[in-house]
């Protein structure tokens, strides 16, 4: 994992990011990038949404970059994780709708559209627009950013291209003092791919099914609980 060691429990000058009850009873330093990995249908996205929702409940900003589902679907599903969706300050970078050729969509306060998951330059631009807006206009000093899913990026682009994109993405989260959350289907990629990508992240949550239909979580890179 990343030698930057962003999960230092003694961050100076900036409050820590709290985690939901499902994860260790620790807080993460501003600028941390967290990878959530596991097989399909093990609840990875739910864990990621819970991390995001913990911020929404604390009046933090939330940004979702979706390469798998439309913004409409993301917003509808996220509503079940927060008490009142109308009070949530959220922005979605939709990388799906234009690719599907759905009408003449335009950016609005909650949704910005990239042309496709291949358009990593466009995705980065839309993310930067939201980050600037959330900090300077909406006045959120604390923002959580979710990328769902890294696996979709790897369907359309090679590992080197995705690695470079994520290196810039994670760096942007770090420089903005945000909390980055990234979801990947670990069974869709070989060990070399997974090990290469894990270098970019400060902490990892491995999600699995315990055999009884319940989600099991294993963590690495988190601060020690004292």
Q: What are these model-derived regions, one by one?
A:
Residues 99-168:
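Phosphate-binding/switch loop-helix module in NTP-utilizing enzymes
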Residues 42, 78-117:
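Nucleotide-state-sensitive switch-loop elements of NTP-binding domains
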Residues 70-75, 100-102, 189-192:
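Short, charged/polar "capping" segments at the starts of alpha-helices
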Residues 13-79:
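Glycine-rich P-loop/Walker A and Walker A-like loops and their local beta1-loop-alpha1 context
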Residues 152, 164-188:
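Substrate-engagement module of ASCE P-loop NTPases
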Residues 179, 183-226:
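Phosphate-binding/switch region of NTP-binding enzymes
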Residues 1-15:
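Short, Lys/Arg-enriched N-terminal segments with co-localized hydrophobic residues
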Residues 74-84, 193-198:
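Short, aromatic/basic amphipathic alpha-helical patches
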């Amino acid at each position: 994992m990343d030698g930057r060691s962003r999960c230092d429990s003694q961050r100076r000058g900036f409050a820590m990011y709290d985690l939901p009850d499902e994860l260790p009873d620790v807080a993460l330093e501003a600028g941390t990038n967290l990878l959530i990995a596991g097989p399909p249908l093990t609840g990875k996205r739910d864990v990621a949404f819970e991390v995001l929702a913990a911020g929404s409940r604390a009046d933090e900003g939330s940004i979702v970059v979706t390469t798998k589902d439309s913004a409409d679907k993301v917003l509808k599903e996220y509503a079940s994780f927060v008490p009142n969706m109308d009070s949530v300050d959220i922005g979605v970078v939709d990388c799906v709708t234009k690719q599907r050729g759905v009408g003449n969509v335009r950016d609005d306060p909650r949704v910005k559209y990239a042309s496709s998951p291949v358009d990593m330059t466009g995705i980065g631009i839309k993310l930067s627009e939201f980050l600037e807006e959330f900090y300077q206009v909406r006045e959120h000093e604390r923002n959580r950013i979710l990328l769902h899913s890294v696996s979709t990026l790897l369907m359309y682009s090679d590992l080197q291209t995705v690695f470079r994109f994520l290196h810039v993405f994670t760096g942007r989260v770090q420089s903005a003092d945000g909390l980055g959350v990234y979801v990947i289907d670990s069974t869709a990629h070989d060990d070399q791919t997974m090990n290469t990508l894990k270098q970019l992240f400060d902490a990892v949550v491995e999600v699995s099914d315990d055999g009884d239909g319940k989600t099991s979580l294993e963590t690495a890179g988190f601060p020690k609980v004292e």
